[in-house]
Regions:
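Short, low-complexity disordered leader/linker segments with a strong preference
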Residues: 1-67, 380-383
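N-terminal secretory/targeting leader peptides
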Residues: 48-51, 62-157, 165, 169-383
Length: 383
């Protein structure tokens, strides 16, 4: 037993010495490493100058900049593009250049009829759409383009803008197309250019008349021959006498298209209906814009309604003079004929519209009543 115990004791002593040896070796290694590090620091301190102390400024994020791809189906320099150009210029200026529009004109990416879907699909971010060219996409919105719904363009523009801004059903039509509504801008009322000296409703019978929107509804009621001609083709169709008369906004928009050099007669005052344009933005693009910039864009959009009306006022007399210079003859549309038009093709079309909306499960009467209420509101404030 003593021999065994001695062997065990010696074995333990040997292991203990081995452990101590390992510990000593580890300490030696760490000491060596520490000396090397200290030596390196000393050399660096002697060999390199000390950096100049600096004060660290608070961390700031650069102001966000947004580029919006805008597309217009028309060339620049005419009413169909200038209203949006004026709005974009104002947005860029008021945001201090933080919002910039990349501008494409001339229908490179879409014609007017396809603008709504192109914006929906994100082909471009922003541009104009129209209830008249896309009635199936904005059925309730077409209340604003019914014949004789409102003769006063300023009243109509403000009522239409507020209608869209405050009516969930109309907002839903834009939302369904991935669009954020910005503003409505007005043209002159839709009147008539003609190759024939018309002075009564009966004089239009048998004529091929370019119509759309509210004018198409009225033509159907009156038994006129309505012809669909897109704006891009109207000058050629007129010059070639494919049509005998054209329901268009005459003194500015029609002048810009050169129609005053083609038609000999301008029938006025004959406000058949008001054409609708809205400027909208793809909702995903809108949601990507910082809130402070959204607020400025919204502010400029609200002002754009009046800016467009001011543009009309500035250009109207120039347009009239251009018509005179081209030798266009004014036909003074009799008030009695206008009254007949309202009775036969105005309110009867409103009734039909309500029925059509109801058949689609839409609140036609509610929307009609609301729009008439807003027109009355703005008419009263303008008196």
């Amino acid at each position: 037993m003593e021999i065994t115990d001695n062997i065990i004791t010696k074995s333990k002593n040997i292991k203990l010495k081995e452990e101590k040896g390992k510990i000593m070796r580890k300490k030696s290694i760490w000491i060596a490493i520490s000396l090397i590090v200290v030596l390196g620091l000393l050399i660096g301190t002697v060999g390199c100058p000390s950096p100049t102390p600096t004060t660290t400024a608070p961390t700031t994020t650069a102001a966000a900049e947004v580029t919006i791809l805008y597309h217009c189906p028309w060339p620049p320099g005419i009413i169909l593009s200038n209203n949006e150009i004026n709005w974009m210029d104002k947005v860029e200026e008021r945001t201090g250049g933080r919002v910039k529009f990349e501008r494409i004109f001339g229908g490179t990416l879409s014609n007017l009829e396809n603008q709504a879907v192109s914006i929906k699909d994100g082909v471009f971010d922003c541009g104009q759409t129209s209830y008249v060219y896309n009635p199936g996409l904005y059925p309730l919105g077409t209340v604003t383009t019914l014949p004789t719904i409102e003769d006063d363009t300023a009243v109509w523009a403000h009522a239409t803008h507020e209608m869209i801004e405050t009516t969930p059903e109309l907002q839903a039509e834009f939302a369904a197309l991935n669009q954020h509504y910005l503003f409505t801008w007005a043209l002159e009322p839709m009147e008539m250019y003609s190759f024939v000296k018309v002075q009564t409703l009966e004089d239009f019978q048998g004529l091929k008349i370019r119509v759309h929107g509210g004018a198409a509804l009225a033509a159907a009621k009156l038994g006129w021959i309505g012809v669909s001609v897109p704006w891009e083709e109207i000058a050629v169709a007129s010059a070639n006498h494919v049509i005998d008369a054209a329901c268009v906004p005459c003194p500015i928009t029609g002048r810009d298209a050169g129609l005053h050099t083609i038609y000999p007669y301008y029938v006025t005052p004959f406000p058949i209906y008001q054409f609708h344009f809205a400027t909208v933005m793809n909702i995903n693009k809108w949601n990507s814009i910082p809130a402070d910039l959204q607020a400025i864009i919204t502010e400029c959009s609200a002002e754009a309604v009046d800016d467009a009306l001011a543009y009309l006022d500035r250009e109207l007399e120039k347009g009239y003079q251009d018509l005179r210079d081209a030798g266009v003859e004014w036909i003074d549309w009799p008030a009695a004929e206008m009254d007949k038009f309202r009775a036969q093709a105005g309110e009867p079309c409103w009734v039909d519209w309500v029925v059509q909306m109801n058949e689609q499960g839409l609140p036609g009467q509610k929307i009609l009543d609301r729009f008439l209420e807003l027109c009355a509101k703005y008419k009263a404030s303008s008196d």
